[in-house]
């Protein structure tokens, strides 16, 4: 595929016109022959195992199956690059063009696009201002729609007629004393009728009329008008025509995107799309032949309906009617199934690509970590930071080349861990938890090597990640360049993301175990009597006594304290004074739990 040099700002998805669909697949050969239309349902010849000409894998349309080799074998090797074989019409080029060259199927009768007919909302019924049920009846040949009422008094534009009503009006036209004048094709059924109705819409004038009606309407009618106007405005803005929602040609995607591969036993495995395309081509060819021999209307009509259903199944199998199934009664995967959903092309392959220097594991709580740290399993770290470790090993002279360094890592040599420790110091990693719904769903941390296979996460950042420890997994990414490392450290480090970008309020707040722990340390418990009333000269003495089991965590004790004390209860404070009234010592009533709580806060404030 030629490399695109020009830069672009965005990609726009819009409806393709029939001319554009054909232009995607059409090419003119040097001899003037135009190729691109797929006319045969065959895939490959069962004897030669070569693609059939004008079939779904045709080399003339899609390019050669082998690099630099035409179909008939007249031209081989790269020196014939760009030559089109006079005998078989295949261009001598790389086989990878079969990944992007398209074809098309010219339909013998128009068919509606099932997305625009059966989608929610149905754009075809919205634009035509007709109920979806009525539009479906016309499309699937259950009713006629009046396209030109002529001078008939009991007929009006877009009126639905049953078969009997249509025959009755036809009889009136050909009656001897009839004054009824109706043009040929005054009523039709099928996608052809919908195509004519959509083509008759003058978008600008219709939009103006709707805007005028909006001022006078209320309630449900107004809502309906707004919906129609919005669709019309979008068509006008994109330069699309409503009749393009009815297909007269359908694109055939490149053959390498719907491959056919030979299995060990000589059988073939093929993409479901090939079966769906084959159904469309078979029915299309049969319809063309029936029209050629002027078959009865009822037979042609039935074939048109079957063609409509085949195209529906190709675009979105199961959206309407019976689901087309293959072997083992398995529903065939249509184009929509390939695109949509979690396993679809966009979410699986385009938005969610696998990247190098990344890994994922289950998260567990790391209560001893600092806010900006995360525990990274050694097994994962050595794999993620392998290029840096190899570079450092060679730099230190421990090994001479990359191969030797890799062998050293595989042997789990004890020396690699000190090197790894040096490498990860100051090198932040990014942690991401899906779904990343806001920017705090991915944050930077300084890795700390831990044993085990789980990533350790600081409990305070759980709110930002919406994480809990019931089996959640997180992905680790290593920023490689110095710029990305600096950006991660300055902008994305967890300790720099204290406030929520949505509300501006703190998002790093104590929850669950932390709140319970703080409450338990500082709560009053009258039942805790062991060691109650004892005096201690320092907080360290009190904690030692608790550790030795001499006092309870919640027992009321007296602690010597030299600072200023504010209390609502004078009984919680005891001061010893000398004869002159000067304070000799001061004791406050507290608990060991409150002493521990106070110590932790004091240490944190001093450290910061």
From Swiss-Prot:
<dbReference type="InterPro" id="IPR007066">
    <property type="entry name" value="RNA_pol_Rpb1_3"/>
</dbReference>
<feature type="binding site">
    <location>
        <position position="70"/>
    </location>
    <ligand>
        <name>Zn(2+)</name>
    </ligand>
</feature>
<dbReference type="InterPro" id="IPR006592">
    <property type="entry name" value="RNA_pol_N"/>
</dbReference>
<dbReference type="GO" id="GO:0000287">
    <property type="term" value="F:magnesium ion binding"/>
</dbReference>
<dbReference type="GO" id="GO:0003899">
    <property type="term" value="F:DNA-directed RNA polymerase activity"/>
</dbReference>
<feature type="binding site">
    <location>
        <position position="72"/>
    </location>
    <ligand>
        <name>Zn(2+)</name>
    </ligand>
</feature>
<keyword id="KW-0548">Nucleotidyltransferase</keyword>
<dbReference type="GO" id="GO:0003677">
    <property type="term" value="F:DNA binding"/>
</dbReference>
<dbReference type="InterPro" id="IPR000722">
    <property type="entry name" value="RNA_pol_asu"/>
</dbReference>
<dbReference type="Pfam" id="PF00623">
    <property type="entry name" value="RNA_pol_Rpb1_2"/>
</dbReference>
<dbReference type="GO" id="GO:0006351">
    <property type="term" value="P:DNA-templated transcription"/>
</dbReference>
<dbReference type="GO" id="GO:0000428">
    <property type="term" value="C:DNA-directed RNA polymerase complex"/>
</dbReference>
<feature type="binding site">
    <location>
        <position position="472"/>
    </location>
    <ligand>
        <name>Mg(2+)</name>
    </ligand>
</feature>
<protein>
    <recommendedName>
        <fullName>DNA-directed RNA polymerase subunit gamma</fullName>
        <ecNumber>2.7.7.6</ecNumber>
    </recommendedName>
</protein>
<keyword id="KW-0460">Magnesium</keyword>
<keyword id="KW-0808">Transferase</keyword>
<feature type="binding site">
    <location>
        <position position="88"/>
    </location>
    <ligand>
        <name>Zn(2+)</name>
    </ligand>
</feature>
<dbReference type="Pfam" id="PF04997">
    <property type="entry name" value="RNA_pol_Rpb1_1"/>
</dbReference>
<dbReference type="InterPro" id="IPR045867">
    <property type="entry name" value="DNA-dir_RpoC_beta_prime"/>
</dbReference>
<dbReference type="InterPro" id="IPR012755">
    <property type="entry name" value="DNA-dir_RpoC1_gamma"/>
</dbReference>
<feature type="binding site">
    <location>
        <position position="470"/>
    </location>
    <ligand>
        <name>Mg(2+)</name>
    </ligand>
</feature>
<keyword id="KW-0804">Transcription</keyword>
<feature type="binding site">
    <location>
        <position position="85"/>
    </location>
    <ligand>
        <name>Zn(2+)</name>
    </ligand>
</feature>
<comment type="function">
    <text>DNA-dependent RNA polymerase catalyzes the transcription of DNA into RNA using the four ribonucleoside triphosphates as substrates.</text>
</comment>
<dbReference type="InterPro" id="IPR044893">
    <property type="entry name" value="RNA_pol_Rpb1_clamp_domain"/>
</dbReference>
<dbReference type="GO" id="GO:0008270">
    <property type="term" value="F:zinc ion binding"/>
</dbReference>
<keyword id="KW-0862">Zinc</keyword>
<comment type="subunit">
    <text>In cyanobacteria the RNAP catalytic core is composed of 2 alpha, 1 beta, 1 beta', 1 gamma and 1 omega subunit. When a sigma factor is associated with the core the holoenzyme is formed, which can initiate transcription.</text>
</comment>
<dbReference type="InterPro" id="IPR034678">
    <property type="entry name" value="RNApol_RpoC1"/>
</dbReference>
<dbReference type="InterPro" id="IPR042102">
    <property type="entry name" value="RNA_pol_Rpb1_3_sf"/>
</dbReference>
<feature type="binding site">
    <location>
        <position position="468"/>
    </location>
    <ligand>
        <name>Mg(2+)</name>
    </ligand>
</feature>
<dbReference type="InterPro" id="IPR007080">
    <property type="entry name" value="RNA_pol_Rpb1_1"/>
</dbReference>
<comment type="similarity">
    <text>Belongs to the RNA polymerase beta' chain family. RpoC1 subfamily.</text>
</comment>
<keyword id="KW-0240">DNA-directed RNA polymerase</keyword>
<dbReference type="Pfam" id="PF04983">
    <property type="entry name" value="RNA_pol_Rpb1_3"/>
</dbReference>
<keyword id="KW-0479">Metal-binding</keyword>
